[in-house]
């Protein structure tokens, strides 16, 4: 499953759980908060595995079966019969990823249950498929489809890997669109789920580089629109979390949009959201990149140099245009994920059939990003007042 289990608590209580209450000026309800463990497990459609079955499937949780680890515990590769979902005797059949909870780990039973609550009932091409779970004595495990290409993080940042090959421009746009579709689905009626932890390590890629969102341990039911939760214990990942969420605890769907904007910057620049190995002023990607997002000429200075001539300059400018709006300080100024999807669809079309335009010779920025009229802005899901390019 890749390294999708990194620590993500910004302000953690001794219990490790973040208590949510609704803003006094708005009202809503969270169905998940009132569900018991029994109700969640009885309502899911995925399989309940015995611990012995998963022990056999992973070859006794051997160290050479480990494909990832983090706050939750370890993720193991395993194999099941595709028809019966029983363990196979040889390394053949359906490849699975088994996430095993560490009883003394950073994350706990509540997040395990949250994953089952959402992935056990939701189905979408851009969400990782949950195949089953195990609840036996102190054992807590989750069984997923195996994502052969690992995480987006592994394809953007070398992290000491000598055989590293950065993701191509075309695939970066594809991954961005896939992830946006998954997030838009979560925000849509009647799902209304706030994902709360969108980041490169939680976007997994299958053998065809189809991107899917994983790790739903921090997900929450709604609210949508202008309503917001107030979290007394803010959880997420430094560098990705929306500023209003970090500073006030206010959380809604636009908080996810901000985090997605950070991912878009990572795709554009090839830099990590937070990198302590860089000079102090360059460690936070958003803070470093913002001054460059004010004009098309500056944008081209921060594009990942490893891409060489793979991209058209106007494509980079259009991606930056989408990112800068997602990263608006004012949540209401950020586009919805449906709007982001529409804008990325148009960007992908331009990658396949690039426009014959030199961005450095275009005086009208609207023409550069393909937004010639007010109506065109609205169709793309871009706010004319907040376009910074």
From Swiss-Prot:
It catalyses: L-seryl-[protein] + ATP = O-phospho-L-seryl-[protein] + ADP + H(+); L-threonyl-[protein] + ATP = O-phospho-L-threonyl-[protein] + ADP + H(+). Pfam families: PK_Tyr_Ser-Thr. Induction: Induced by flagellin (flg22). GO terms for molecular function: ATP binding; protein serine kinase activity; protein serine/threonine kinase activity. Keywords: ATP-binding, Cell membrane, Kinase, Lipoprotein, Membrane, Myristate, Nucleotide-binding, Palmitate, Phosphoprotein, Plant defense, Serine/threonine-protein kinase, Transferase. Coiled coil: none annotated. The modification Phosphotyrosine is found at residues 144, 245. GO terms for cellular component: plasma membrane. Interacts with FLS2. Interacts with PEPR1. This is Probable serine/threonine-protein kinase PBL1. The lineage of its organism: Eukaryota, Viridiplantae, Streptophyta, Embryophyta, Tracheophyta.
